[in-house]
């Protein structure tokens, strides 16, 4: 559902931000 999509997007966003901070 829409909530799952939102959760997936949030996870991907956090992963991306964490990656940028790590670099």
Curated annotation (Swiss-Prot):
Principal location listed in the UniProt entry: secreted
Asparagine amide modifications at: 23
Signal peptide extent: none
Gene Ontology CC: one annotated term: extracellular region
Record's keyword terms, sorted: Amidation, Amphibian defense peptide, Antibiotic, Antimicrobial, Secreted
GO biological-process terms attached to the record: defense response to Gram-negative bacterium
Keyword Secreted listed: yes
Tissue: Expressed by the skin glands.
Domain of life, source organism: Eukaryota
Subcellular location per the Swiss-Prot or TrEMBL entry: Secreted
Physiological role: Antimicrobial peptide that shows higher potency against Gram-negative bacteria than against Gram-positive bacteria. Has a very week hemolytic activity.
Family statement: Belongs to the ascaphin family.
Protein name as annotated: Ascaphin-1
The species this protein was found in: Ascaphus truei
């Amino acid at each position: 559902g829409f909530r799952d999509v939102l959760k997936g997007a949030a996870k991907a966003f956090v992963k991306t931000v964490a990656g940028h901070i790590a670099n």
